[in-house]
Amino acid sequence: MPELDHLIFASPDLSEGVRIIDSLSGQKAVPGGPHVNFGTKNYLLTFNDKTYFEIIGIDLNQEKPTRPRPFGIDTMSRPALVGYAIHPT
């Protein structure tokens, strides 16, 4: 049976997104890494050995990509839960 892999929370201001989720969860998200050529990077909160929460936002250390950033981050007015990923089993 398929299982939840991760939830995706996007924010045009990554620092703000991390602050929101840290405050709501009572945990501290850890840096994940950059998404090269997408202009984004992420922070992660691990729920268990199979499931995590991804906070994704604009990576100010990368050039703006030639295509729109994923999840509509370029046009977002506020952070939001934007998706999820499923583990096929």
Language-model regions, residue ranges each:
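Conserved catalytic-core motifs of GNAT/GCN5-like acyltransferases
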Residues: 28-36
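Short acidic/glycine-enriched loop/turn segments that link adjacent beta-strands
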Residues: 37-41
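Glyoxalase I/VOC metalloenzyme domain signal
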Residues: 1-4, 9-28, 47-89
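Short beta-strand scaffold segments in enzyme catalytic cores
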Residues: 43-45
